[in-house]
Curated annotation (Swiss-Prot):
Disulfide bonds: none annotated. It is found in: Cytoplasm. Its EC number is 3.6.1.9. Gene3D superfamilies: 3.90.950.10. One of its GO terms (cellular component) is cytoplasm. It comes from the Bacteria. Its cofactor is a divalent metal cation. This is Nucleoside triphosphate pyrophosphatase. GO terms for biological process: nucleotide metabolic process.
Length: 199
């Protein structure tokens, strides 16, 4: 009998991706101080990949420790722009500043997923996507932030590709699901391999 999957997140888009893929799950937000952890890892010169992976594992472990027998999925996404990690914008001015830094340039999104069982990691994957933004005007970016602030305030890089943010981009190299914050294809393969999803 398949074990229950718990998504250690309150991310609506991740929950929707799992539901749309037919993966039965519940959600339970794992509260960790992400900025403090990022700062500590950056001080140790950890790579963006390792930072995303560590945060995803911490979230999965936190819920897994409380739910024996369940498989718990933790996720995290970081944005690397020329060696600088961008976080979720603190306000609309910060969102505009982030978008201005990203325009007419490339950046990388790293989406980590870790599954823990009984407090121990049993599977992990970090998906990588490279994106290039158009050379959009300040006026367009200001209007974009004003129109979309409620939606983009919780998005690294201050955009959502599944919404109007797609108009900002000229090229995307990588998996769409990874851009949305979950390497879904790899996760589905793992769940099928362990017998938790029929194939």
């Amino acid at each position: 009998m398949p074990q229950p999957l718990i998504l250690a997140s309150t991310s609506e888009i991740r929950a929707k991706m799992l539901s749309n893929a037919g993966v039965p799950h519940t959600t339970s937000g794992a509260r960790i101080d992400e900025e403090m952890v990022k700062e500590a890892l950056l001080a140790e010169q950890a790579s963006p990949r390792d930072i995303a992976d560590t945060l995803a594992e911490m979230k999965a472990r936190k819920i897994s420790d409380k739910t024996p027998g369940a498989i718990v999925l933790g996720c995290d996404q970081v944005l690397d722009h020329r060696g600088v990690l961008l976080s979720k914008p603190v306000d609309s001015h910060d969102a505009l500043t982030q978008l201005q830094a990203l325009r007419n340039d490339r950046h990388t999104l790293l989406s980590a997923a870790v599954i823990c069982e009984d407090g121990k990691p049993v599977w992990r994957h970090v998906g990588v996507v490279r994106l290039r933004m158009h050379d959009v005007s300040d006026a367009y970016l200001q209007d974009y932030v004003a129109r979309n602030w409620d939606s983009i305030r919780h998005a690294v890089g201050a955009y959502k590709l599944e919404e109007e943010g797609v108009r900002l981009f000229s090229r995307i190299d990588g998996d769409y699901f990874t851009v949305l914050g979950l390497p879904l294809l790899e996760l589905l393969s793992y769940l099928a391999l362990r017998g938790d999803l029929p194939r």
